[in-house]
């Protein structure tokens, strides 16, 4: 089987689709797109449906179409805070203890701002 064992016949992919570079998709990412080889999708990025990603997408950016940045999910200070506390790397127990915060963006941001040092200790 070809294509990671999913297709029985051989497929001759065009050269630009050849898998020769690793694609890196970071944490907290939503995708609905075509991602070409060699691209890194930053933490917290959103890639709109049918977007074609040919270059790296910055952390927390929202991209669409030809992966043009439409806007960012958060203000720069919140993005920097999230990069520092890296909540996606918190230990399982800490995540479980604070899982209710993930249902309310404002509560989550307030908690992280007020407890930054504690959050960093749980990475």
Where in the sequence are the language-model features?
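Hydrophobic face of beta-strands forming the core of extended beta-sheets/solenoids
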Residues: 25, 31, 35-37, 41-42, ...
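C-terminal amphipathic helix plus adjacent low-complexity
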Residues: 103-123
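Histidine/lysine/aspartate-rich catalytic loop segments that bind and position anionic ligands
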Residues: 77
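Leloir-type glycosyltransferase catalytic cores
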Residues: 86, 91-107
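Flexible, glycine/small-residue-enriched loop-and-beta-strand segment within the central core
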Residues: 1-39, 67
């Amino acid at each position: 089987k070809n294509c990671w064992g999913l297709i029985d016949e051989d497929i001759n992919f065009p050269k630009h689709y050849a898998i020769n570079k690793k694609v890196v998709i970071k944490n907290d990412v939503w995708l609905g797109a075509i991602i070409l080889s060699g691209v890194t999708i930053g933490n917290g990025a959103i890639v709109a449906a049918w977007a074609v990603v040919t270059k790296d997408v910055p952390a927390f950016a929202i991209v669409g179409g030809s992966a043009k940045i439409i806007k960012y999910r958060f203000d720069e200070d919140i993005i920097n805070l999230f990069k520092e506390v890296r909540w996606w790397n918190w230990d399982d127990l800490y995540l479980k203890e604070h899982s209710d915060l993930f249902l309310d963006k404002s509560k989550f941001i307030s908690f992280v701002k007020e407890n930054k040092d504690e959050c960093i200790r749980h990475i």
